[in-house]
Amino acid sequence: MLEIHALNQFYSGSHILRNVEFTVPDAQLTVLLGRNGVGKTTLLKCLMGVVPVKSGSIAWRGKTLTSAPSYARVSSGMAYVPQGREIFPRLSVEENLLIGAASRPSREAKRGVPDDIYELFPVLRDMKQRRGGDLSGGQQQQLAIGRALMSEPQLLILDEPTEGIQPSIIKDIGRTLRRLVDERGMTVLLVEQYYDFALELADHYRVMSRGAIVASGLGKDMEADGVRHMVAV
């Protein structure tokens, strides 16, 4: 379980995260929703150690990681797919994937890209020698997720993976995330603006507003709880 307790963060005097507190249960998919600018991306960066926290704590499976460097969090089983994908455009698809294996023992990384990555994302096998920058936005998103999975995480954190992506690939990504949870027991924290995508996938939901968690519950109750109205622009 991922546990976030009383997390606070400031930017240039502005209070961005305000006593953020929630859990992400093991082997389930939790969606974090909220309008633009409420602090969702900042929260994810704090979880991964990209941005330091001012106060509060972060624990993953009982181990406190609040002050741990990013590489230690990856080594503990966390992986992050950032907003905007951030692939390496001049490297091949295969090279991008292998970078994701950097935290694995060298003997494991030398084995190359596991078949299960290509099974989840067949297009990456077909294009493994093409440069990452030549892929479409949807293909790059699949590459970014595949790269994160190369570290063999137990917790996968994604920041708006449907942004700017065609509907057919959105469906593919949704099916893949559901498989990771249902078949592999992976824990997923998904920040998402596309409400219907979140509704379809969520086991649990959390809603952020003005830097704080203002609602939470089971995914099956999102409509009854009025979550659509809470996050409508």
Where do the PLM segments sit?
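Conserved ABC ATPase signature
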Residues: R131-L135
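ABC ATPase C-loop
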Residues: A148-L149
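Helical segment within the ABC ATPase nucleotide-binding domain
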Residues: K171-R184
